[in-house]
Amino acid sequence: FENTIFQFLDFQSSKDITNNEAMAKIAGGGNLSNYYNEFKIAGSDNGVNPLHLMARSSQEGANKATYNSVAGLFTTNVSSDSSYAYNKTARGNTLNGYYNFYNIGAWYGNGYSAIGRGLAYAGGFLESDSCYDVLNGVGTYNVERCGILSYLRPWNTQAIAIAGGANFISETYVKMGQNTNYYEKFNVSPKTQYSLYSHQYMTNIHAPASEANSLWNAIVAGSLENEAFEFHIPVWSDQER
């Protein structure tokens, strides 16, 4: 029971419940173990539980340093990333130096592979061509010319990617009524600012339970079981009690 109920944890009221021991359980010695402070700051600044942010990042693959979304190195694969997305728009054929710890915007379409599009979003590649400088096949968003984009983009350092992604999750999900793992996947929140059943964060139907298990194990490892947790559990009419 405990390892699944945390899919209903309210991320806002639990924003201060974390410690290094809990984070270490999620990271397990992987890539995310290098970013405890970054997740704490991102959670504090955006009013979201840092353990949720780290568990989400791990679920999305960022705990592996060589994973393309966080490795900082990505070259166009012509078999999955079309010339339209990169060459026709003269944005270069690499997305080196950009990071996306939560795979935000990472879906296949418009000539991009899923990871390719996520990194294009992180780097600002989906913005106006006038904001781009291209040198030796590498495109760079020009901040001085066009300014910082929404959610702190371009995400050109790991710390900015963690903070900016947390801001995206907070502003477009948590503060819009989708403030639990369950609601982020199954949007039946009575407080949602979107249409019911729409605006899902991920396609994986097992993700809420999987992330809940990670959260519970982290809470136990951090000896946080006696903290005051608030849960938002949807109850259906005619549901057996």
Regions found by a protein language model. Give the residues of each.
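Extended amphipathic alpha-helical segments with heptad-repeat/coiled-coil character used for oligomerization
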Residues: 70-72, 77
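Solvent-exposed, polar/charged alpha-helical surfaces in well-ordered, non-transmembrane soluble domains
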Residues: 37-41, 54, 163, 167
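Non-catalytic cell-wall polysaccharide-engagement segments
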Residues: 80, 84-241
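Short, functionally critical alpha-helical segments immediately adjacent to catalytic or ligand/cofactor-binding
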Residues: 40-68
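Conserved aromatic-histidine-acidic binding/catalytic patches
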Residues: 31, 40-48, 149-153, 157
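N-terminal export signals and maturation junctions of secreted/periplasmic proteins
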Residues: 1-36
